[in-house]
């Protein structure tokens, strides 16, 4: 959760019970923000949500992705960007914890290289693709730091074989 979520006022993600890390860093003169992405969403959906917040636009999950996964193409509209001036001259330093690390890696990949499949699907549908899917904006990120991120998967299934087998049989 992030600063746009209600729970953040009670228990900020960065700092939780010890106080807000973003407030602490702000008091020290650092400009910090906590983006809000879906807690149970895919890395793709979360990357699209992060882009929309940084750009101050409507979340566009992509024509192809929405068709492939059976959900709406558009999500929340962010009328104001998380901060003004995001771009090459004002690049961000991303910090992602846990699945946020995987999310920010995918975000940077799409921001840098785009998604040709989404561009083609949008154009075939006669609509404009999101600027996010066009790529060419890798310089808009100065750095990416991942903390305890599952970049190489997880050992959960191996460690919980009986549990996962039972869950699969119930499905």
Residue ranges with predicted function:
Residues 51, 58-171:
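Serine-dependent carboxylesterase/thioesterase catalytic core
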């Amino acid at each position: 959760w992030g600063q746009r979520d209600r729970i953040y006022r009670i228990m900020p993600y960065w700092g939780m019970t010890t106080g807000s890390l973003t407030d602490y860093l702000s008091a020290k003169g650092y400009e910090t923000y906590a983006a809000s992405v879906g807690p149970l969403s895919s890395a793709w959906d979360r990357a699209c949500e992060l882009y929309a917040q940084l750009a101050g636009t409507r979340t566009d999950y992509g024509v192809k992705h929405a068709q492939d996964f059976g959900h709406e193409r558009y999500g929340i509209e962010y009328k104001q960007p998380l901060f003004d001036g995001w771009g090459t001259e004002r690049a961000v330093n991303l910090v992602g914890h846990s699945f946020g690390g995987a999310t920010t890696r995918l975000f940077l990949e799409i921001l840098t290289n785009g998604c040709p499949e989404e561009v083609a699907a949008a154009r075939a549908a006669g609509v404009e693709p999101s600027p996010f899917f066009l790529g060419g904006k890798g310089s808009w990120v100065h750095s990416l730091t991942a903390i305890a991120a599952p970049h190489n998967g997880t050992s959960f299934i191996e460690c919980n074989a009986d549990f996962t087998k039972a869950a699969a049989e119930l499905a």
